[in-house]
């Protein structure tokens, strides 16, 4: 006898455990008859089919059926004869209405009211280790405990505020009464009263600020303890489910999952360095395109339970990495810093799900850990120091300043770092119009950008910015000390995104000038990035925003040049005051550079430059165009090959000839000569530019011995008009040391 097979798990269906046949003649086990997306148990009267795809034989709940509008009522199955409805049609209508009521009641009981519309998720099937009902029940228990905690917080805040107001009132009355007595005796005047009120106000505000800070720290500590316990309970639910599925191979619809379940540990493993790099997991974020799009779509709507949120986020995930990615992108898109909460916020509302943000007791890292527990992922919160806003190279980490918190999540068999707060980038598009005042208008103008560097960051890169309290959570083979962390160069995420590295592995954040007053920084560039990376720099005093010394720009004491696959910054320190060198970079295409449009540079690293003594006179470089010296930019951006001088510095006599060969058509070469203390107009006759076929020849006749700067400009043969004008673009520059006999 041929037995029917379950459409979900493919195993035989026996009469005692059979659902069906359905309209498409398919059968299910009772345990398999669940929503394909969220895992909600279904009944004959409550299941839905995909009406947009007749080949889709899966079953869905009303909230997740992938129709154009999954919340439309099910069409009444009525038939008409001679324009009249048949009795069967009326029965069908009543049956459809009853089915809709059943679905509404079922979803209300399970707290699955979610925002509409849902994103259209296309994948092979959602596989969840934990039963939906069991996870929802546990979340509701957690929610009640959390409600009690926040009620306690509100009561404590009320009592604390009342006590503060009483103490403040008593203090003011006493101080003002004392002033009144002195005023009556003539030992005080009106001006002194104003000073007294001002001092009392400052004292009151400071006291309130201190009380608020202490209260928030206390509430944050209690909330974190609660969430940690709840995360353990949620992960224990996953552990039990995985163990049950491993013991019973015939259970449910997760045969493929049960085979891989033992690979994920039931308890958090100890911190160990990763056995492979991030590049072994992925090299292009395009692999997460679908996961990211779902997260962005969900973030623009609201959900009422963490269970529904996480199940929808990871519905298309096929690995632990993709689950963590979905949570990371949802948090980085959800702009927690500007969320506005009503005072009468309902705890079971969509915004109530994030009420910890309102109370200041929950942040990116705590929320990330909570969501990871709902996805069955081990996650820890790590505390320590970070080189965050306001930090400058050379600073010491003392007390509570520059304290920070981040996460480590266990995916792909290793602990990996995640920093959701630094990964979030919410930029308002200024082109959309003037600055919007309302939060909703600002939200509409957000461009959802993020920093992928802070997702699964390699430990050898993460240590440049973050130092944990526990050395084991450096995830390094050889952990470093806090002093070593302070001495590491101060870099930003773009440094690693552009594939940069320091050619001197012992380079420190504070660089001491040599006996000649020179300090060198050499940055290596990956071959892939060397053709489109453009660098810039800024030099100012370390302890102020001043950028000039004795009327001269400090930039003129820095020489930037390129050599092979590296960029070199040579600083000729003109003062004993400490300096701050900020190095910028940006990836720019040749086409964009040739337009002459401004380029927005971003900081990649900073250094403190120190010169203990300066018994010499530093001569500033000639006032040339900003940017690197030497012909490498000419070749990189203009295909202009240097034939005679490949270095940035030319040592010559009174006469010098510089030759280039054009590898693509260029037109209208212009060369300008500069020298300190000499008007550029007096040097125009000293330069002659000639183009012969593909050869570009620049002849120089230097009038006096000394140092000169040569700027070379050009444009493409096919002119590009900017505001109706043909602009020349800076091509390269040389530094000439001339000896004239």
Predicted features along the sequence, with ranges:
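Intrinsically disordered, low-complexity segments in eukaryotic adaptor/regulatory proteins
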Residues: 1-253, 258-260
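N-terminal interaction/assembly modules
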Residues: 1-47, 52, 293, 311-313, ...
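Core residues of folded domains in eukaryotic genome-function proteins
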Residues: 2-5, 9, 15-17, 24, ...
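Secondary-structure boundary elements
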Residues: 265-360, 366-375
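Catalytic cores of secreted or luminal carbohydrate-active enzymes
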Residues: 437-503
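Beta-strand-enriched, solvent-exposed domains that form extended recognition/catalytic surfaces
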Residues: 505-741
């Amino acid at each position: 006898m041929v037995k029917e097979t379950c459409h979900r798990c493919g195993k035989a269906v026996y009469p005692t455990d059979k659902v069906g046949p359905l309209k498409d003649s398919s059968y299910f086990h009772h345990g398999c008859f669940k929503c394909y997306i969220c895992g909600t148990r279904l009944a004959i009267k409550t299941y839905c089919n995909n009406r947009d795809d007749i080949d889709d034989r899966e079953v869905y709940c009303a909230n997740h059926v992938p129709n154009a509008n999954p919340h439309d009522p099910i069409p009444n199955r009525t038939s008409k004869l001679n324009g009249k409805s048949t009795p069967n049609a009326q029965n069908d209508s009543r049956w459809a209405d009853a089915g809709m009521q059943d679905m509404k009641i079922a979803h209300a009981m399970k707290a699955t009211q979610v925002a509409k519309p849902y994103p259209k998720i296309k994948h092979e099937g959602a596989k969840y280790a934990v039963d939906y009902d069991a996870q929802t029940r546990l979340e509701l228990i957690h929610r009640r405990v959390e409600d009690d905690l926040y009620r306690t917080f509100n009561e404590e805040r009320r009592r604390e505020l009342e006590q503060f107001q009483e103490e403040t009132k008593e203090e003011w009355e006493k101080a003002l009464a004392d002033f009144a007595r002195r005023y009556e005796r003539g030992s005080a005047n009106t001006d002194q009263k104003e000073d007294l009120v001002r001092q009392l106000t400052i004292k009151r505000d400071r006291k309130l600020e201190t009380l608020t800070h202490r209260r928030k720290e206390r509430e944050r500590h209690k909330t974190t303890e609660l969430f940690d316990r709840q995360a353990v309970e949620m992960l224990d639910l996953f552990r039990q489910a995985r163990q049950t599925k491993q013991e019973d191979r015939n259970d449910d619809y997760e045969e493929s999952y049960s085979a891989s379940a033992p690979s994920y540990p039931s308890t958090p493993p100890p911190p160990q360095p990763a056995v492979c790099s991030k590049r072994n997991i992925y090299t292009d974020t395009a692999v997460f395109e679908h996961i990211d799009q779902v997260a962005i779509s969900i973030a623009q709507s609201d959900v009422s339970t963490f269970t529904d949120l996480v199940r929808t986020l990871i519905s298309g995930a096929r690995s632990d990495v993709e689950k963590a990615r979905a949570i990371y992108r949802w948090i980085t898109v959800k702009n927690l810093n500007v969320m506005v909460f009503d005072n009468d916020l309902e705890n079971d509302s969509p915004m109530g799900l994030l009420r910890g943000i309102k109370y200041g007791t929950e942040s990116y890292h705590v929320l990330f850990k909570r969501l990871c527990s709902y996805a069955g992922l081990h996650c820890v919160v790590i505390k320590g120091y970070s080189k965050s806003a306001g930090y400058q190279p050379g600073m010491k980490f003392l007390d509570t300043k520059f304290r920070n918190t981040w996460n480590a999540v266990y995916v792909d068999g290793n602990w990996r770092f995640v920093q959701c707060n630094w990964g979030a980038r919410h930029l308002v598009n200024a082109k959309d119009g003037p600055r919007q005042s309302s939060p909703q208008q600002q939200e509409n103008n957000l461009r959802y950008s993020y920093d992928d560097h802070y997702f699964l960051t390699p430990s050898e890169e993460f240590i440049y910015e973050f130092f944990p309290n526990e050395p084991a959570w450096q995830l390094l083979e050889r952990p470093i000390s806090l002093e070593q962390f302070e001495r590491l160069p101060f870099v930003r995420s773009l440094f690693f995104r552009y594939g940069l590295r320091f050619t001197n592995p012992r380079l420190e954040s504070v660089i001491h000038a040599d006996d000649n007053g020179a300090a060198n920084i050499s940055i290596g560039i990956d071959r892939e990035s060397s053709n489109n990376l453009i660098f810039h720099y800024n030099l100012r005093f370390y302890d102020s925003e001043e950028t000039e010394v004795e009327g001269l720009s400090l930039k003129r004491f820095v020489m930037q040049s390129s050599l092979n696959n590296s960029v070199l910054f040579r600083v000729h320190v003109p003062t004993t005051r400490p300096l701050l060198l900020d190095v910028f970079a940006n990836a720019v295409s040749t086409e964009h550079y040739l337009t002459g449009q401004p380029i927005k540079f971003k900081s990649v690293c900073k250094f403190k430059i120190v010169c203990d003594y300066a018994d010499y006179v530093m001569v500033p470089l000639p006032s040339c165009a900003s940017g690197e010296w030497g012909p490498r930019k000419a070749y990189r951006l203009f295909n202009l090959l240097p034939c005679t001088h490949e270095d940035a510095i030319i040592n010559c006599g009174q006469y010098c000839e510089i030759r280039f060969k054009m590898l693509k058509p260029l037109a209208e070469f212009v060369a300008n000569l500069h020298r300190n203390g000499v008007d550029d107009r007096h040097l125009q006759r000293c330069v002659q530019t000639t183009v012969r076929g593909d050869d570009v020849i620049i002849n120089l006749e230097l009038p006096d011995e000394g140092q000169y700067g040569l700027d070379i400009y050009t444009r493409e043969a096919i002119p590009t008009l900017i505001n109706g004008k043909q602009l020349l673009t800076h091509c390269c520059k040389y530094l000439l040391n001339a000896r004239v006999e």
